[in-house]
Structure formats: structure tokens, C-alpha cells
Amino acid sequence: MASPREENVYLAKLAEQAERYEEMVEFMEKVVGAGDDELTIEERNLLSVAYKNVIGARRASWRIISSIEQKEESRGNEDHVASIKTYRSKIESELTSICNGILKLLDSKLIGTAATGDSKVFYLKMKGDYYRYLAEFKTGAERKEAAENTLSAYKSAQDIANGELAPTHPIRLGLALNFSVFYYEILNSPDRACNLAKQAFDEAIAELGTLGEESYKDSTLIMQLFCDNLTLWTSDMQDDGTDEIKEPSKAEEQQ
């Protein structure tokens, strides 16, 4: 008979197939809470996919609403703008709640139980990602705090990744990809973003021949995202001066 942990993992997979990601999160939170053992690679990937989909839907909604708000403001439609702001704040409350949920799990359990280099980097990168998602819409002191926490988590992950993971390792590449996006989109540092992306790409290219078959697809997919972002960023830097909301970076490797 399956243990409660195995049952919840199975239910999380079912929820993923049914695209019921909120329930997938609930099942994986039960797995995390079930014991003090480190999650398996399959379990941590399921947790990541669950949260990525739940947060991804709201991030997309927020971007759409913010774009409409900007257009209505430029037209002087004050009544519409007031309605949009109220609606946007509802989405922001959901985003905050989701981010706080996974950040609590990471700090209280997951980072502390991580025993290997790749799992430590995986969870610290995840911590950086969810603080970055907060920094996307927070303002003032809250945005500053979220950005500082993002930078701290990504730097901690980078230190471990550079010492313990190969330049072609998908988790190390994914970290560099998202770290570069943070520099570009949150810190408004296109030069640092491009330098980080180019360095990670070049280091991986130099060792491409050592890639095992199992990680070749993941690693080369992320390397393509580096290329896409660098193309987008360099064209944005040349076109600077427009007030439009820029196309979001292609970043954030797919789990």
C-alpha cells in the first residue's frame, strides 16, 4: 500500500495532467510537510512546476492589466484607471500570497534539508525567483527589500554553482539566465545582464562536448534562451527612449 507521501506525489501528478495547479501545490506542500527527508529530484521538480504555473498565470494577468492601465492613463480615462487599479491590487494580493507561501517553505524546510550542491542551488535559485516576482510589482521600500533578497539568494546560489556544478549543468545555466533577467528587468542594468548572460553562455559552449545525453536537451534549450534575451536586450538598448512596456525577457527556463 502506498504511503501518504507517495499518494500525494501521485495526486500531484494527476493534478498536473488535469492542469489543476492550485491543487498540485496543495499536494506537494503535504509532501514537504510529511517528514524531514530531502525531496527527491522528481518531487522538487513537481513542487517547482506547481508553483511556476500558479504564479505564472497571475504574472501574465498582471502584465496585461498593467499594459491596459497605461493605455487608459494616456487616454485620460480616469474612471477606467481607478477600476483597473482596484483590479490590479487584487491580482497583486494573490501574487504576494503565492510568493510568501513558497518562500516560507524554502526558508523553514527545503533549503535547510538540501544535502547536495545541485539541490542547494535549485532551492536558492527558487528563493531568488520568487523574491524577483515580488519585486516586479512592489513599489518603494517593499520593492527595494524584495530586490535585495533576490540578489542575496542568487549570489548564494551562484557561489555554490560555480564551485560544484559544471558550466553546462541545467540548474547552473537556469540560475545564470534568471539572474541576468533580474539585472535587466529589476535593477535596470542591461550591461551587467548582458555580461552575465554572455559569460555563462561562453563557459557552457566551451564544455558542450562533455554534456551527457540526459541533460543535453535541457542545457541547449536554456542556451537558446540566452541568445533570445541577448538579441532582445541589445535591440532594446538601441531603441531606448520609448515609453512602451517592453516585451518581457524570454527568461526563466521551463521545468
From Swiss-Prot:
GO terms for cellular component: cytoplasm. Gene3D superfamilies: 14-3-3 domain (1.20.190.20). PROSITE patterns: 1433_1, 1433_2. Disulfide bonds: none annotated. GO terms for biological process: protein localization; signal transduction. InterPro entries: 14-3-3 (IPR000308), 14-3-3_CS (IPR023409), 14-3-3_dom_sf (IPR036815), 14-3-3_domain (IPR023410). It comes from the Eukaryota. PANTHER family: 14-3-3 PROTEIN. Belongs to the 14-3-3 family. This is 14-3-3-like protein A. It comes from Nicotiana tabacum (Common tobacco).
